[in-house]
Amino acid sequence: MSKKATYPKVMCTQHPDSASKYISTQEEPGEAIEAAVVFGCDEYMPDYEGKATPYHQNVQIVSRFIEETDLIPGKDIFITPRAPSAAQENRFRQLMVMMSIAEANHGALEYSDVQAINEFVHPMTGTVGEILDAQQHMVDVGELAKKEFGVAMEVPRIIPLIEDAPALLHAKELAENTLLSWEKRFGAAPEKFRVFLGKSDSALSFGHVASTLSCKYAISGISELDLELDTSTGIIFGAGTLPFRGHLSLKNAENFFREYRGIGTITLQSAVRYSHDKGEAEALVRLAEERLPESPEIYSGEEKEEIVNLIGIFGARYNRIIREMSCTINQLAGLLPQQRDRLMHKGTGGYSRNVPDISGLVCLCRKDVGKELSASMPAEDLNLPRAIKFTGALYSIGLPPEFIGTGTALEEAREKLGEEACERLLKKYFPSLASDLSFASGYLDLNVASRFLPEACLKEIRKDIEVLRDTFSLKVQPEPSYRILLEMMQPDLLQAGTKGNCMDEEVSQLVCSTLTKMGKIRKALG
């Protein structure tokens, strides 16, 4: 069995983070062609998670590649759908997506001997059982397709997407136990297996620093596993362009590739393709092709222990503030434009995420750190919007979420873990934090933000910024055009952020237009 398996390096996705372009589901098959032909991506992810994507989109995309290009799906361009989670949405939608995978493969195998779709992504993965059940569903669909339509396809492999901090800390165990159980259930472990790590949702739940450390902890663990098992593992890293969501942009590429060494595939989301300067996305793709994968950083046992306690401290400080701001965030998020055809579920921002189970994180922390983290978590689900609108809402009131809880957590880490631990945080565990905060400071305006914040929150955030300004010599100078928009919209934004108030349609459109202009300036909706 070869350990030199290769994987696609750039996955184009349907994330709705572009500030400048709305893309309907009808346009997405054309977008898939553009991803490969114009941007140079070697993978495309049709997205069915929380999204009103037609079931036949997989078939449309594969057919159009065959009919309109010289690229062979499954060989020159990889189509990797994200199916819904049976636990979080419903099993019917998951099975329908799997049937569309079988239909797409049937069409491709009539054209050539290459199977078009060989993997699918499973979102919000928390347990081995979820992974194996979804894989079993794919096996069952494959058998049905063979019986009814004569489709003799190789069963596509699942890619678990791990998205919250506690799960990221157990990514190695989850992947290892999956592969061991896979062998028992299906007869043999797969030769290749990819894991998808998400930056955004862990940031929403635990803050920017805790999220970054959790992702890097997971990269280290899965890289260890690759050395220990026969199965060749690969890592997809999901990141947007703003620091809170991963800071994957051409300008920050050097920091990004150094920070997340060990990943094999990046996501090229909508913002970098449509809201950044022309040519930047293509240049980023070429850079990824040259750089990925790089040798991973493997943490020692002592380093892992220190990182976990840092995650606990930063996560607690962040959550203390966020739980007091949820109403404002939800109402502002509802005014941001919808850039893809989302399913509407609970929460203002549509398909939202639940508060994660933190027991898997608390048990790894020191007792005092774990206790503080537990106390910081909201007593009930806040129904916060999805990460893109969450991030966009906070940037739109002059408070980039990268700052929330970060300064006070840095002070607390110094007190509890010592000066050397903080030095390792800034120089080894998260060296690009300074550049992330420098970027975000161009959109920070506490005078505007103060109108939306409870006094207790404002006091904590002022302290955060004071500590960070001293530590990193930050120059808090909002871009003039951005500041003008913030100042101009204060009364209407304040109205939007006040519980119980409703806007008339004209004012709502004006606010939405102004928020969109702010997104265009920062080159991402969120």
Curated annotation (Swiss-Prot):
InterPro entries: PEP_COase_arc-type, Pyrv/PenolPyrv_kinase-like_dom
Signal peptide: none
Pfam families: PEPcase_2
Domain of life, per lineage: Archaea
UniProt-listed GO biological process terms: carbon fixation; oxaloacetate metabolic process; tricarboxylic acid cycle
Cofactor: Mg(2+)
Keywords: Carbon dioxide fixation, Lyase, Magnesium
EC number assigned by the record: 4.1.1.31
Top enzyme category: lyase
GO molecular function, one term: phosphoenolpyruvate carboxylase activity
Catalytic activity: oxaloacetate + phosphate = phosphoenolpyruvate + hydrogencarbonate
Quaternary data: Homotetramer.
Function: Catalyzes the irreversible beta-carboxylation of phosphoenolpyruvate (PEP) to form oxaloacetate (OAA), a four-carbon dicarboxylic acid source for the tricarboxylic acid cycle.
NCBIfam families, sorted: PEPCase_arch (TIGR02751)
Family that this chain belongs to: Belongs to the PEPCase type 2 family.
Protein name from the UniProt record: Phosphoenolpyruvate carboxylase
Species per Swiss-Prot/TrEMBL record: Methanosarcina mazei (strain ATCC BAA-159 / DSM 3647 / Goe1 / Go1 / JCM 11833 / OCM 88) (Methanosarcina frisia)
Organism classification: Archaea, Methanobacteriati, Methanobacteriota, Stenosarchaea group, Methanomicrobia
